[in-house]
């Protein structure tokens, strides 16, 4: 009987450890996803700012050519 009790408690302990490991992996994956999303948003913002700057520079050049 005591051997079954030891085996049962060992299985329960192992199950709990595996569950905690899965939860930690899920949390790490979620953090990685959030960081990737933030990086994507940052690159999108940088791209939009660059695009607007290029448009403004192009308009300035065309405006100066039109004045000549």
Swiss-Prot record:
Main location: secreted
Acidic residues bias (residue ranges): 25-35
UniProt GO BP: defense response to bacterium
UniProt xrefs under InterPro entries: Dermaseptin_dom (IPR022731), Frog_antimicrobial_propeptide (IPR004275), FSAP (IPR016322)
Propiece span(s): 18-38, 67-68
GO CC terms, sorted: extracellular region
Signal peptide: 1-17
Residues with Leucine amide modification: 65
Subcellular location: Secreted
Keywords: Amidation, Amphibian defense peptide, Antibiotic, Antimicrobial, Cleavage on pair of basic residues, Secreted, Signal
Annotated stretches, region: Disordered: 19-40
Tissue: Expressed by the skin glands.
Summary of the function given for this chain in its UniProt record: Has antibacterial activity against the Gram-negative bacteria E.coli ATCC 11775 (MIC=0.5 uM), and the Gram-positive bacteria S.aureus ATCC 12600 (MIC=0.5 uM) and M.luteus ATCC 49732 (MIC=2.0 uM). Does not inhibit the growth of the fungus C.albicans. Probably acts by disturbing membrane functions with its amphipathic structure.
Similarity remark: Belongs to the frog skin active peptide (FSAP) family. Dermaseptin subfamily.
Name this protein carries in UniProt: Dermaseptin-H5
Organism of derivation: Pithecopus azureus
């Amino acid at each position: 009987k005591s051997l079954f009790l030891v085996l049962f408690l060992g299985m329960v302990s192992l199950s709990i450890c595996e569950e905690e490991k899965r939860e930690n992996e899920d949390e790490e994956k979620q953090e990685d996803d959030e960081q990737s999303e933030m990086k994507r948003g940052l690159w999108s913002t940088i791209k939009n700012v660059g695009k607007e700057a290029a448009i403004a520079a192009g308009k300035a050049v065309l405006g100066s050519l039109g004045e000549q």
